[in-house]
Regions:
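A structural signal for short hydrophobic beta-strand segments in well-ordered beta-sheet cores
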Residues: 9, 135-137
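Extracellular glycan-interaction surfaces
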Residues: 119
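Catalytic-core segments of class I nucleotidyltransferases/pyrophosphorylases
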Residues: 85-86, 93, 98-110, 123-127, ...
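A generic fold-level signal
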Residues: 4, 68, 80, 111, ...
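Glycine-rich N-terminal loop/short-helix segment of MobA-like nucleotidyltransferase
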Residues: 1-13, 26-28
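Conserved N-terminal catalytic core of the sugar/cofactor nucleotidyltransferase
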Residues: 15-89, 93, 165
Length: 171
């Protein structure tokens, strides 16, 4: 499926996964979106132009080599003065049901002056029962270890300062 179409442009019913993501972001009141691309990025660029969304969307390419998640995020934030970023995996199946949870996560992040927060779910709620889990919760902190009961579902908020000591590369 994704040899000729980037995963975010796959459709569920008549809407792409990326469009669902952008609609949720818009529902959150966010007016500026940065998108990092690599595989078939020209298709994503054309899709954004064609749809004419009501938010300001800037697209930045990885370049010759894929930067993966960390490098892709760094590629986006290195040239901006913004300090805090809400990051979505655009190949996650987002819908409006997540808006309340994301708003609660934002409120918690800013009221507690955090540097990073991840949106996680109990792995029992996943349709895919093969997940081992990404994290466990201990003393209100996510940790990796045995008995990981929570899965990262593709949304996080972080402060740009987390990337200060990294060079732009694949990570």
């Amino acid at each position: 499926l994704t040899l000729e179409t980037p995963k975010p442009l796959l459709k569920i019913k008549d809407t792409t996964i990326l469009e669902n993501c952008i609609n949720v972001i818009s529902k959150l009141g966010i007016k500026k979106i940065l998108i990092n691309t690599f595989h078939l990025g020209d298709q994503i660029n054309e899709f954004i132009k064609m749809k004419n969304f009501e938010v300001d969307i800037k697209i930045k390419e990885d370049g010759k080599n894929i930067l993966d998640t960390g490098g892709g995020i760094m590629n986006l934030v290195k040239d901006t003065t913004d300090q805090d970023f809400l990051v979505f995996n655009p190949d996650t199946l987002w819908n409006y049901k997540y808006v309340n949870e994301i708003n609660e996560m934002q409120d918690f992040y800013f009221s507690n002056k955090l540097n990073c927060i991840l949106l996680v779910a109990d792995k029992k709620l996943s349709f895919d029962k093969s997940f081992n889990g990404d994290f466990k919760l201990k003393d209100n902190l996510l940790q990796k270890g045995e008995d990981n009961n929570f899965i990262y579902i593709g949304c996080k908020i972080f402060n740009k300062s987390l990337f200060e000591n990294y060079n732009l590369k694949n990570f």
